[in-house]
A protein has these predicted regions:
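Soluble periplasmic/extracytoplasmic beta-strand elements of cell-envelope proteins
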Residues: 45-50, 63, 116-120, 132-138, ...
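Short secondary-structure boundary motifs at beta->alpha junctions and helix caps
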Residues: 69-78, 144-183
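Surface-exposed short loop/turn segments
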Residues: 20-37, 97-143
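A structural "domain/chain start" motif
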Residues: 19-81, 113, 189-200
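Sec-dependent bacterial lipoprotein signal peptides
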Residues: 1-19
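Sec/Tat-exported extracytoplasmic proteins
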Residues: 52-55, 94-99, 125, 178-181, ...
């Protein structure tokens, strides 16, 4: 083996080792900013039951672009948590900022909500300079009869095709959706009686 061949082999081995040991950067959704206006008065309570995102987005590699059916994925950055969990967490927090924390229940709270809320994202896709959002949502009243469903479609500006920009745009999109949902809660507050049962 010639010295030149040995040197080339050593450089190749070092390059492979460097690639194998390159750390993966993790990115998380930032918290939603506080709204300019909020409904802090009494009102119906809401439990965010289920949030789903498309399966192609609900994995750890960060999708930074989409053109048609072709996805562009970051090769060095992953989500710090499964996207469906992060989306639900940030959306729940954004709702609590708009409706008051006491009105947005969490699993295991022990109280019966006035409304169950389900959200299905059909798209939460980074495209050319925008994050495209298409979400179906449904409120179901738990005491009185009634429900309300809708579909929200809009675009949020995307600063760049990078994981950090995608995370920031996703949180902005969730805050905008929370504005819509907070104004759409259809159910009246559950009426509780203050009377104590009579002991015979």
């Amino acid at each position: 083996m010639t010295p030149a061949y040995r040197a080339a082999a050593l450089l190749a081995a070092l390059a492979i080792a460097a690639c194998a040991s390159a750390p993966v950067t993790l990115v998380a959704l930032p918290p939603a900013p506080a709204p300019e206006m909020r409904d802090a008065g009494p009102g119906p309570t809401v439990l965010l039951r289920k949030v789903t995102v498309p399966g192609y987005l609900d994995s750890f590699p960060v999708v930074v672009g989409r053109k048609g059916s072709v996805l562009a994925v970051s090769d060095s950055t992953e989500w710090a948590e499964r996207p469906s969990l992060g989306v639900a967490r940030v959306l729940r927090d954004a709702l609590s900022q708009r409706l008051d924390a006491a009105r947005v229940l969490i699993e295991g709270d022990g109280r019966i909500p006035d409304a169950d809320l389900t959200v299905e994202f059909l798209a939460l896709d980074p495209q050319e300079a925008v994050l495209h959002v298409d979400a179906r949502w449904s409120f179901s009243c738990t005491a009185a009869r009634g429900s309300r469903a809708g579909r929200s479609q809009f675009d949020v500006p995307l600063a760049s095709a990078t994981p950090g920009a995608v995370a920031a745009a996703t949180t902005e999109a969730l805050a905008r959706l929370a504005d819509v949902l907070a104004a759409a809660v259809p159910c009246p507050p559950r009426q509780y009686s203050d009377r104590k049962p009579t002991v015979r």
